[in-house]
Structures are given as structure tokens and as C-alpha cells.
UniProtKB/Swiss-Prot annotation:
Organism: Escherichia coli (strain K12)
Name the record gives this protein: Ribose-5-phosphate isomerase A
Similarity annotation: Belongs to the ribose 5-phosphate isomerase family.
Top EC class of this enzyme: isomerase
Lineage: Bacteria, Pseudomonadati, Pseudomonadota, Gammaproteobacteria, Enterobacterales
Mutagenesis / variant outcome for changing D81A: Catalytic efficiency decreases by 10,000-fold, with no measurable effect on affinity binding
CDD domains: RPI_A (cd01398)
Subunit structure comment from the entry: Homodimer.
UniProt-reported outcome of changing D84A: Activity decreases by 250-fold, with little change on affinity binding
Residues that coordinate or bind substrate: T28, G29, S30, T31, D81, G82, A83, D84, K94, G95, G96, G97, K121
Thermal behavior of activity: After incubation at 45 degrees Celsius for 30 minutes RpiA retains 90% of its original activities.
A Pfam family per the record: Rib_5-P_isom_A
Annotated pathway: Carbohydrate degradation; pentose phosphate pathway; D-ribose 5-phosphate from D-ribulose 5-phosphate (non-oxidative stage): step 1/1
Active-site residues annotated for this sequence: E103
């Protein structure tokens, strides 16, 4: 199976967690896009979705799914999203698609976070994938200096502005042995909006696409 076929398999597998009559939290990226396609088959059974990016919002609306602003919603049963890396503790690096802040906000509200990914995203230690950090533009250089002190090599993601109007620093060369401590340390830097480490709030369920089928891991 190709990588895209594995992504499609987990996107459709996540449909089993969608309860009729609910509002579904939806992530961003190529794997989440397959979940949105699958969700389109249930558009008459769900109330709608909360989206983590403008791109996902457009796709949801194109399929006839009502998109709620998060401020209109009291609670979310599930949030379904991909990951750039996921470890054995269900902690993740996310933000390759630059939607990390909205993704983290929606994940924090959801009762259950379902991570959908192909097997290539599984790692023992997080950090080989460059760690995205969303930063207020005026603080870019100041934040970069602090990230160097934490052992990373920050690189400005040229030409990218987040949906919130901020910039992204991708931090290379990190071997993140204590993801919770690293998440807290980076989030404490003035000017950081959020870091793409999902360690304090990791996934509850991981659906991993393998050539032998979809593997389910429960926290």
C-alpha cells in the first residue's frame, strides 16, 4: 500500500468513533483530509464540525458539513487529527501544516483525541521531525535565541503566515527525552503562542495505518 492509501485507511477507520447527533473536532493535513472525506458520508447524521484551519473549514463546507466556531460549542466528544510524529506514550509532534495552535486548543476541549497516522510516524524519541513553534512576529529573533539555549537549531519557515497571523520557527536537532518538560519550557518563552509538542495533552487513541491493516492503540 502507498503512504496515501495508509492515510486513507486510518481516516476512514476513525469514522467508527463518530456518534450521530454530535459536533466533531477536525484537524488539518493530508491524513485529516481523508477523515473529512469519510465524515462527508455522515453529514446528515452529525450536527457539524469544529475545524482547526481555514483549509479544513473550506473542505468541510464543500461537503455540506456545517462548521461551528469553537465559541459556540460547550463540549466536543472527539477530536480527530494526524501527527508528524507519535511516541509510545501517545505524545506527538504536530504543526507541519502550521495549524498547531488551533489544533491544540480544540484538542484541549475534546473528551477524546484520536490520532490518525501511518506507521512511518511512530518513533521512540520525538524530535527528528523539526519541532514547529508559532511565534508573534516581533518576537521571532528573541524566541529563536531562547530555542538555541534549549539545544535546538531554529529555522524561520519562509513565506508562511499562520491563520492567526503569526510566523513559524521549525526547531531542528532536538532529541526530546522529556516531552512534557520541553513543552512547558518552550511555552514559557515570551512571544511563543504555542509549541507543536502535544505532550501534556496527548492522544487517547491512535489509529496506525500498516500494510497489514489499521492498528488501534489505546492509552
Amino acid at each position: 500500500m502507498t503512504q496515501d492509501e495508509l492515510k486513507k485507511a486510518v481516516g476512514w477507520a476513525a469514522l467508527q468513533y463518530v456518534q450521530p447527533g454530535t459536533i466533531v473536532g477536525v484537524g488539518t493535513g493530508s491524513t485529516a483530509a481523508h477523515f473529512i472525506d469519510a465524515l462527508g458520508t455522515m453529514k446528515g447524521q452529525i450536527e457539524g464540525a469544529v475545524s482547526s484551519s481555514d483549509a479544513s473549514t473550506e473542505k468541510l463546507k464543500s461537503l455540506g458539513i456545517h462548521v461551528f466556531d469553537l465559541n459556540e460549542v460547550d463540549s466536543l466528544g472527539i477530536y480527530v487529527d494526524g501527527a508528524d510524529e507519535i511516541n509510545g506514550h501517545m505524545q506527538m509532534i504536530k504543526g507541519g501544516g502550521a495549524a498547531l495552535t488551533r489544533e491544540k486548543i480544540i484538542a484541549s476541549v475534546a473528551e477524546k483525541f484520536i490520532c490518525i497516522a501511518d506507521a512511518s510516524k511512530q518513533v521512540d524519541i520525538l524530535g527528528k521531525f523539526p519541532l514547529p513553534v508559532e511565534v508573534i512576529p516581533m518576537a521571532r529573533s528573541a524566541v529563536a535565541r531562547q530555542l538555541v539555549k534549549l539545544g535546538g537549531r531554529p529555522e524561520y519557515r519562509q513565506g508562511v503566515v499562520t491563520d492567526n497571523g503569526n510566523v513559524i520557527l521549525d526547531v531542528h536537532g532536538m532529541e526530546i527525552l522529556d516531552p512534557i518538560a520541553m513543552e512547558n519550557a518552550i511555552n514559557a518563552i515570551p512571544g511563543v503562542v504555542t509549541v507543536g509538542l502535544f505532550a501534556n495533552r496527548g492522544a487517547d487513541v491512535a489509529l496506525i495505518g500498516t500494510p497489514d491493516g489499521v492498528k488501534t492503540i489505546v492509552k
